[in-house]
A protein has these predicted regions:
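Non-catalytic interface/linker regions that flank or bridge core catalytic/transmembrane domains
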Residues: 1-51, 55
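Active-site flanking loop/helix segments enriched in acidic
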Residues: 34-70, 150-157
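Divalent metal-dependent catalytic cores for phosphoryl transfer on phosphate-bearing substrates
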Residues: 64-219
Length: 219
């Protein structure tokens, strides 16, 4: 039986995560938020983004080699079968990975895909390929390598500097675009769906506030 999320050495996944850990830092996350905060790169329809994304290969995922558009339609269809009356959830399934359009703006794979994690505090051992994190420029910085780091207990996930990629980019697009009807619940599912160290690994609970416990149940 195939095991999902089985990460092996000497694979495209390991190479991508190594590059991610070498480059995703507190300063990088700040710079990416600043770089994309104006959302002035392009204007595209959902169908156009889905087509463009088929030119992108997600080398972080060991479980599927399907074109991105097929993955999007399959996800939406599976949700429709299980929740036929929940249109918001179906739309969320369709668009959840559209932030991968970042590759079209020249971003390398390591800044587009992969599990997300928090910069500016201790890096938990449940992170994929944890042993390669020692080469992260922030790893030995005493300001960033304590349990709380630069944050306060219970500050809320939205106060954390999470590694920047397709989830955060799409969340910011939705947050600044008032022409959609998705509620904050489904926007948060998009924002945190790759945050595996948190929702699956049990890390970062110390930072959660009351609303984050609701988000965790939703995810």
């Amino acid at each position: 039986m195939h095991k999902f999320r089985e990460y092996k050495i000497n694979t495209p996944q390991e190479r991508l995560y190594y590059n991610m850990y070498m480059n995703q830092t507190v300063d990088f996350v700040k710079s990416q938020h600043l770089k994309y905060s104006k959302l002035n790169n392009c204007t595209m329809k959902i169908s156009e983004v889905l087509n463009v994304m088929d030119n992108f290969v997600d080398s972080s995922d060991p479980d599927t080699s399907l074109p991105n558009s097929i993955h999007a339609y399959q996800t939406a269809e599976r949700i429709r079968k299980k929740y036929p009356n929940n249109k918001e959830y179906q739309i969320t399934g369709l668009i959840h990975d559209l932030g991968k359009v970042l590759f079209k703006f020249g971003e390398p794979n390591w800044s587009v895909v992969g599990d997300t994690f928090v910069l500016g505090c201790e890096l938990p051992k449940c992170i994929v390929y944890y042993d390669t994190l020692k080469d992260n420029p922030d790893f030995n910085n005493p300001k960033y390598n304590t349990k709380l780091g630069i944050y306060q207990k219970g500050c809320g996930l939205d106060k954390l500097k999470i590694s920047f990629g397709h989830d955060e980019y799409l969340y910011q697009v939705l947050k600044q675009n008032k022409n959609h009807l998705l509620s904050e619940k489904y926007m948060n599912i998009i924002r945190y769906h790759s945050f595996y160290p948190w929702h699956t690994g049990g890390a970062y609970r110390i930072f959660m506030d009351q609303k984050d416990h609701i988000i965790l149940k939703d995810i």
